[in-house]
Design a protein with these regions (language model features):
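Hydrophobic transmembrane alpha-helices and their immediate loop junctions
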Residues: 1-188
Length: 188
């Protein structure tokens, strides 16, 4: 169940970035064929394999031109948040379907859909480059402060690998995922 849930989550995540960017005035994702729900436009199979093996991976990132976005700074933050928000909403929908269906049938797929999409949501909200959370932080902090954290762009992947290997990333994502599942249980 993990692989189909992951492909769906990555596809919706990147589509949401592309859709938000185009709606905010940047034609780049449309010109690159990224405003589609076709997984082949968004999936990087090495990134999917890493996610299955390590608990984190990547899809093909959507390229944007921030200068084309309405409300340039805030537009960039909205585009960055569109992906994690779509994963959170998809996780909620999957949880609701899992809760409504009898054990067996498709319930396992929807349970994995909820957990995988929560992982994608919370992983991408971390303020470490190249993740979406860093794009939001970059917009929010003053330029002089940004220079103090710019070095992160060079070492972001290394930081994520180390956090994953020592188990910190798994604990943080697991705690966030558990809290969201409890929230869904109260709602549904």
């Amino acid at each position: 169940y993990t692989l189909p849930a992951l492909v769906l989550g990555f596809t919706l995540h990147e589509f949401s970035h592309a859709f938000a960017a185009v709606r905010l005035g940047d034609p780049t994702p449309r010109l690159e064929g990224r405003v589609t729900l076709n997984p082949s436009a968004h999936i990087d199979w090495v990134g999917v394999l890493l996610f299955v093996l390590l608990g984190w991976g990547y899809a093909r990132p959507v390229h944007i031109q921030p200068g084309n976005l309405k409300g340039r700074k805030w537009g960039e933050a909205l585009v960055a948040l569109a992906g994690p928000l779509s994963n959170f909403l998809l996780a909620a929908a999957c949880y609701a379907l899992w809760d409504a269906l009898p054990a067996g049938s498709w319930s396992g797929f929807f349970y994995y859909g909820a957990t995988v999409n929560l992982t994608l949501c919370f992983l991408n909200l971390l303020p470490v480059p190249p993740l979406d959370g860093f794009s939001v932080v970059r917009v929010l902090i003053p330029l002089r402060s940004y220079r103090a954290v710019a070095w992160l762009q060079r070492y972001g992947i290394v930081i994520l690998v180390v956090l994953s290997l020592v188990g910190v990333l798994g604990r943080v994502l697991g705690a966030a995922q558990a809290a969201a599942m409890q929230l869904f249980a109260r709602i549904f």
